[in-house]
Amino acid sequence: CLHFHYAHAVPQARLGYSVFNSDGEWCGVILFSNGANQFIASSFSMVQGQVMELVRVALNGKQECTSQALAMALKLLKIDAPAVRLVVSYADRNQGHIGTIYQATNWYYLGEFASERGIMLNGKLTHRRSINSKYGTSTIDWLREHVDPKAEVIKGETKIKYVFPLDKRCMKTIKSMSKPYPKR
């Protein structure tokens, strides 16, 4: 993750799968988590544990086909986490992404959503979760009063949301929510 993904960070993951090419060379990882948003399942009328987030596709380029690697990871996820009915992922417009890999693997596009890059705190852009972990809160008013009077939320480009159903029972709902794919 540190070397093969633009974020240069390893996210918290519940399940991860190594990717190898046909020569047996390790090519990277595909990681899934419960998601940063504790309400990730509610917009789909599901409960926590039925929805996971694809948090990282970090590959070194030696794999034969990224879409095939992702498809295999989704099949393994379905086996290893049978309670999971849906996978959510986001394409990051801040990186110029529109979700080409999700389009290539037939995910459903749900739209674009406001994105926060982080909070400028003491002159440094910091992720809200890191601030919350350190101070027990990340509310701007509290941070301005106790840490940095100049603290401010930094907005980013929108994130593009895609979902991949693992359970046929949720297909009708997902299809009704889906929109045409965005283009460059």
Predicted stretch roles:
Residues 1-12:
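Short amphipathic alpha-helix that is part of the acyltransferase structural core
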Residues 33-152:
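Acyl-donor binding region in acyl/amide transferases
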Residues 175-184:
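Short, cationic low-complexity segments
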Residues 14, 157-162:
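Short hydrophobic/aromatic beta-strand or adjacent loop that forms the aromatic wall/cage
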Residues 13-34:
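Conserved beta-hairpin
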Residues 136-137, 167-176:
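Hydrophobic helices that insert into or interface with lipid environments
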Residues 22, 33, 57, 165-167:
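Structured loops at beta-to-helix junctions and adjacent beta-edge loops in soluble globular domains
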Residues 152, 157-159, 170:
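C-terminal accessory module of base-excision DNA glycosylases/AP lyases that mediates lesion recognition
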